[in-house]
Amino acid sequence: MWFKNLLTYRLTQDVPFEPEALEAALASKPARPCASQELTTYGFVAPFGKGADAPLVHVSGEFLLIAARKEERILPSSVVNDAVKEKVEEIETEQMRKVYKKERDQIKDEIIQAFLPRAFIRRSMIFAAIAPRLGLILVNSASAKRAEDLLSTLREVMGSLPVRPVTVKIAPAATMTDWVKSQHAAEGFYVLDECELRDTGEDGGIVRCKRQDLTGEEIQLHLSTGKVVTQLALAWQDKLSFVLDDKTVIKRLKFEELLQEQAEQDGGDEAQQQFDASFTLMMMTFTEFLPALFEALGGEEIPQGV
C-alpha cells in the first residue's frame, strides 16, 4: 500500500476515531452495485481483503486506513444527444410543430432512463489514511473533487467531520520559483529535472520542461521575464520523490527502493502482512515528510478562530 498522489486535510478539532465506532459508521453506507435506473452509487469497502468479514477500517498502530468505491453507469453525452436530436426531428416532422426546451428536456430524461440498464459500468476506488495524533487525513488522490466526495461521505456517516485542506503561509509558486532561481531548495529537499512555468498574465504562456537541467540559462531566462514555477519535481532525503504544484497537491509520489525493500522484509511472505508493513512504513515516512514540507513552504497557515 503505497500512495501515488496526496491531498492533505487538517482536522480542526479533536476527533477520537475509535476503530470500532468508525467501523460501524462505515458499515452504515457500504458500496453496492448500481440498480438498473441508477447513474451512480458510492460507499465504503474494505481497504484490504474481500468478503463480509473483511474490516472496513484497517488499523496499524496509531494509523487508520479506509477506502470508498464509486460505481457509475457510463452514458456518453454524444450518444444521448444524438438520440434526443433524432427523436425531436421525428416529432417535428410527424406532428409539424416546434419542440421547445421543456419538452426536449423531458425527452432527454426518458432517453437516459431507457439507456441506463444497458450502459457500461465503471468502478473506481479511493483510499484515505487517518492520523489522529497528527490531526491529518491523507487522501490518495490528486483530484480535490474525488477527495471531497470521500470526505463528505465520511462526514455523512460520522455525523461530523471538522476538516479543511492544509494551506501554507507562503504561496507554493513563490517558494518553488525561489528554489529554482537560487538553485537551492530547503534543507532535505532537492530540485529534480522537471517543472512547469507559467506567465502571470491573464493569457500567459505555459512552458513544461522534462529531463532538463533547471539550473540552465534557458530556465533562468524564463524566470527573469516574469514566469513562475507552478509545478516542480522534488526529492526528499533518500526516501521519496514527487511533483508539487501551486495548490500544494503532491503528485507522482514514488517511494525509493530502500523503503520498499524494508517493507518487504518487515512483511514477510503473507499478503496481508506485506500490506500492513508497507502502509505502516509509508505513514511513518509521512509523519516526518509532511511537517518538513509544510515548514519548507513557510509553515502551515492556521485560520483565525481555529
Swiss-Prot record:
It holds the Pfam family RdgC. GO terms for molecular function: double-stranded DNA binding. Keywords: Cytoplasm, DNA recombination. Coiled coil: none annotated. GO terms for cellular component: bacterial nucleoid; cytoplasm. One of its GO terms (biological process) is regulation of DNA recombination. InterPro entries: RdgC. The keyword Cytoplasm applies. It comes from the Bacteria. It is found in: Cytoplasm, Nucleoid. Belongs to the RdgC family. May be involved in recombination. This is Recombination-associated protein RdgC. The lineage of its organism: Bacteria, Pseudomonadati, Pseudomonadota, Gammaproteobacteria, Pseudomonadales. The gene is rdgC.
